């Protein structure tokens, strides 16, 4: 049976449109509660959220749905996704729920779940919820209704968890760090963690109003951070996204380092301390230069499908700890059960402090191949694999690039977009090929029979 509502990272959409409506979210929570009650007499669910204005409404709907199924609820308030995962495990809750659409703008929102162990839930569990959604509600009698309470020190508990991942004999004293929390879930905890580790912190993107999450700030708009690092003559800049499960870092020169580079640095730091790293999981998008640099160190590299869910599955299957993707989702399963933007940033800063080296020095072995990523809006009910013009263009581009480049075409798991990626040793070639593929996709959907408007192969 196929899943109707769950995507690659829970359920996500535009608020007020199915499935992100109060009535559906209430039914969803009720269905999840019924699944939990099959194995637990009195389940307890933790609910956290980011700073979107719709979070209040959806939080109330979840609370009502869970209580109606006989499930108790603990409200955490605004908290990074990894904080919810941590507290779900630490509080021995039955389930963790996050209300967030991650890096998307405020009109979107979503619901995602964590198991009692703080990890993403299985396809089988999601299918069980889909099945329960298709059945009539089974309202619990009044005597067995659930209750709700707030965990007032949730943020402080997560702050301590983050600090405890940093070496006790090191600190950030003497470092000036700009933190951009994207007006999102880490707007309070992010600056506090860094300050309590003795850094001088300039906080930007830390004034949420319910409508400004991810708006020209955060990991999806790193230029804002780069400008702030220059303006404040900072040593480092840290960019998080709306739910703080991803991170990008800027050095004192304004150079931006993506998740691929930070993943390599984390591996190199561990190996430099004689830790064994048997293998690393990236994605189909991971830069080829990182793969080669890891292999040169004797580290096996495996590509999973795009998305931290699939990285996690592959890491678990192989019993490895480290994985990540260029967007800044980084996994260190011996530190946390899920991607943690603040925790990953601390690992990187710790490596710099311990070695007394800059990011550029630590990443001297990696020179990324130019990559061009374009987004093409997918028309409703269109299967990109049947686009004949795009298929022909892919074949032509792959022949031109040969072994020195890569083409990756995929549908986004969270938005109605086709992702077009071209990687080549030459930046202009990568750009022209990506533009050709994007134009081919658009032309194919518009019913065109040729690519007259596409740039010629190899054009600047």
Swiss-Prot record:
Residues that bind Mg(2+): 102, 241, 243, 245
InterPro entries (alphabetical): A-D-PHexomutase_a/b/a-I, A-D-PHexomutase_a/b/a-I/II/III, A-D-PHexomutase_a/b/a-II, A-D-PHexomutase_a/b/a-III, A-D-PHexomutase_C, A-D-PHexomutase_C_sf, A-D-PHexomutase_CS, Alpha-D-phosphohexomutase_SF
EC number: 5.4.2.10
Any one Gene Ontology molecular-function term assigned to this protein's record: magnesium ion binding
Cofactor(s) the protein needs: Mg(2+)
Active site per UniProt: 102
Keyword Ribosomal protein found: no
Keywords of the record: Isomerase, Magnesium, Metal-binding, Phosphoprotein
GO terms under cellular component: cytosol
PTM note: Activated by phosphorylation.
Keyword NAD: no
SUPFAM superfamilies linked to this entry: Phosphoglucomutase, C-terminal domain, Phosphoglucomutase, first 3 domains
Database matches in Pfam families: PGM_PMM_I (PF02878), PGM_PMM_II (PF02879), PGM_PMM_III (PF02880), PGM_PMM_IV (PF00408)
Residues with Phosphoserine modification: 102
Catalytic activity of the protein: alpha-D-glucosamine 1-phosphate = D-glucosamine 6-phosphate
GO BP term (any one): UDP-N-acetylglucosamine biosynthetic process
Family the entry assigns: Belongs to the phosphohexose mutase family.
HAMAP family xrefs: GlmM_B
Function: Catalyzes the conversion of glucosamine-6-phosphate to glucosamine-1-phosphate.
Protein name: Phosphoglucosamine mutase
